[in-house]
């Protein structure tokens, strides 16, 4: 079992009844150039997607921007897991796939909060769940990376809600 010690930090995923969702893949030690590129492409695909996270656009406009960027870099996107609405519950509607044709799905409105989370693979997009029921791996055993932040749709540019308030960016 995991035990926290006094000098360790922990993460809080809700404040005043509202949730946020974020994740990132970071290199540990020496990693291959392919792994570094995968991590960079995954992170950038989030930013490519949120360029379309604007009032009046549709969910699939975000999805298509992510897919177009990732596939142009020679990678694939996990299709079994998607981004989602976030708020009073950690996972809410609407679903936000990382792939698809533009112009479909829910129309974005100010006040909506979404978790945008590209999951990018070196090989096939297919994944498998291990017998523990929790761990997910690529079906072909190749590398995968994940980058996620919660955003708010506004009258103008989207606001990234899960960035630290001290100006640091991960």
What annotation goes with each model-predicted range?
Residues 1-6, 11:
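Single conserved hydrophobic/aromatic residue that forms the stacking wall/gate
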Residues 3-4, 54, 109, 146:
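Residue-level recognition of short, solvent-exposed, well-ordered loop/turn junctions
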Residues 14-20, 27, 31-115, 119-125:
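Conserved, well-structured core segments that form or line functional sites
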Residues 98-104, 120-144, 168:
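A conserved acidic, glycine/proline-rich C-terminal tail/linker
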Residues 149:
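Acidic-aromatic/histidine active-site loop/patch
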Residues 153-157:
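Short acidic-glycine loop/turn motifs at beta-strand connectors
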Residues 161-164, 170:
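N-terminal segments that mediate ammonia production and transfer
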């Amino acid at each position: 079992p995991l035990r926290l010690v006094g000098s360790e930090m922990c993460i809080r995923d809700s404040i005043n009844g509202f949730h946020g969702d974020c994740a990132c893949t970071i290199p540990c030690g020496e990693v291959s150039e392919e792994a570094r590129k995968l991590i960079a492409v995954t992170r950038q695909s989030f930013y490519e997607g949120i360029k379309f996270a604007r009032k009046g656009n549709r969910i699939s406009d975000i999805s298509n921007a992510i897919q177009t960027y990732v596939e142009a870099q020679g990678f694939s996107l996990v299709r079994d897991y998607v981004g989602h609405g976030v708020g009073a519950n950690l996972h809410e509607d609407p679903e936000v796939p990382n792939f698809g044709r533009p112009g479909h799905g829910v129309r974005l409105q100010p006040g909506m909060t979404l978790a945008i989370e590209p999951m990018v693979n070196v090989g096939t997009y297919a994944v498998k769940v291990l017998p523990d029921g929790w761990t997910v791996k690529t079906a072909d055993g190749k590398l995968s990376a994940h980058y996620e932040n919660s955003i708010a749709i506004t009258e103008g540019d989207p606001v990234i809600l899960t960035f630290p308030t001290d100006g640091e960016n991960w």
